[in-house]
């Protein structure tokens, strides 16, 4: 997200830091969450080993909260709408894995042998830029690598050619 001038950048920074920016992600995950909608609330901690690192669920780690909603089911997979309430590194991927539904194509927190592309993307962002105006909502189209999977789960989006 870019601002045209320092004042705009400061305002955007305040919105993000204050949790006033609404972010929505879509994911195709393995399995089915325990409920049609819910909240995942865990601590997350960075674990460094050998040549790499990854995040793990840890009760004394940084607080991380994600709300989810199931949008479609089929073929042993689910289409989830994810709304992070905090902004931790790899939060959505770790949270999906923590409820037994790793993101399809996630070689770190899911099945490294699947060979599929990561099925997670930022669907929309809503910015309350001005108090007297409606928030600005920006929605991204479904990326090409996710279209077929989402269609199998019930999503139908007209794609401009």
Report residues per predicted region.
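RNA pseudouridine synthases
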Residues: 2-161
């Amino acid at each position: 997200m870019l601002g045209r001038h320092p004042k705009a950048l400061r305002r955007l920074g305040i919105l993000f830091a204050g949790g006033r920016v609404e972010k929505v992600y879509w994911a195709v995950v393995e399995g089915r969450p325990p409920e049609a909608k819910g909240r995942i609330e865990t601590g997350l901690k960075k674990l460094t080993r050998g040549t790499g690192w990854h995040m793990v669920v840890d009760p004394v780690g940084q607080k991380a909260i994600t709300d989810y909603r199931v949008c479609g089911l089929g073929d042993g997979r689910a289409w989830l709408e994810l709304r992070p309430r905090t902004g931790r590194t790899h939060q959505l991927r770790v949270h999906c894995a923590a409820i037994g539904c790793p993101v399809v194509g996630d070689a770190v927190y899911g099945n490294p042998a699947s060979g599929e592309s990561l099925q997670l993307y930022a669907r929309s962002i809503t910015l309350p830029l001005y108090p007297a105006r409606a928030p600005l909502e920006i929605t991204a189209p479904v990326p090409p690598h996710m279209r077929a999977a989402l269609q199998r789960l019930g999503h139908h989006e007209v794609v401009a050619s």
